Amino acid sequence: MSNYEALLKFNRKAVSKEMVQYLASTTASIIKIKKTNSMIDIALPAPPLTKFINRLIKHSNVQTPTLMATSVYLAKLRSIIPSNVYGIETTRHRIFLGCLILAAKTLNDSSPLNKHWAEYTDGLLILREVNTIERELLEYFDWDVTISTDDLITCLSPFLKPIKEEQLYKSQRDCRTLKNFSAQEKDIVNKTSISHSRSSSNMSIPSLASTSTLSTLESRRSNLSNYSNRIRTLPELHESNNISDKFSPRTYNIDSKHDNKENRPIPTIKPFNFSKARPVILKTGLNKQIIKEDTKVKKSNWSNYFKS
């Protein structure tokens, strides 16, 4: 952030206690005060400078740009007034009021009149004294009341430096946040790709069926087949063969002497003779019930009623 951008951001801020304290300390550094034992100073003591500045801000409703431009005039006046000069108790109040009036009239198209500024002092200064203060300051400045951007940056550097540091910290934090966010996105993408590859590998059978798994399955199948063969007895085999001979045209020649499976002969299948097969005639439709009607006329009891 440049100094000009920091200055623009500073001008948008509201008036704070730090600003008032800075203006009061700058005004106090211009001239020294020599205490007097006059009856006027004892009867009507001047308010503290910070309280006086706060009162002017409240009555005039001055904003930060105009208020802080007063520091440029205060800095110029500090370089003009000799260091061996002493003022009275209200000298600092007069200096600040004169610089504020010049800043308000220079930077604004419409500003309070001097009679209004005299009222804002709550009786500390009268209108004639306010007019005198303004003319004396114009003579000190040789009627040159221009305020440049460089002057503002120089005088307000204590306020601009924290703004620049804060902006730098925010930019670095945003950069770190962006890097962390991009790193998290990469991690998420990597995790999703890994999970996708795992799911796709799980769907493929060869990757899941290893050699050990296949051998285990084959051994289990062979054990089950041997166990079932042991349970099955010879009479059951003969019964099953007899049943198959009755209901199927195939006949198996099983030699009981051959107990081993390897020496058993291969069963022979007799060819089926299709010439001896009788054709099957399928009837279409349903059998109709034949209703026998009795055509003979039966005598009924009604004939008795018609006889004469």
Curated annotation (Swiss-Prot):
Compartments where found: Cytoplasm; Nucleus
Record protein name field: PHO85 cyclin-2
Main function: G1/S-specific cyclin partner of the cyclin-dependent kinase (CDK) PHO85. Essential for the control of the cell cycle at the G1/S (start) transition. Together with cyclin PCL1, positively controls degradation of sphingoid long chain base kinase LCB4. The PCL2-PHO85 cyclin-CDK holoenzyme phosphorylates LCB4, which is required for its ubiquitination and degradation. PCL2-PHO85 also phosphorylates RVS167, linking cyclin-CDK activity with organization of the actin cytoskeleton.
Alphabetical list of Pfam families matching this protein: Cyclin_N
Principal location listed in the UniProt entry: cytoplasm
Species this protein is from: Saccharomyces cerevisiae (strain ATCC 204508 / S288c) (Baker's yeast)
Keyword terms, alphabetized: Cell cycle, Cell division, Cyclin, Cytoplasm, Nucleus
Gene name per UniProt: PCL2
CDD domains, sorted: CYCLIN_ScPCL1-like
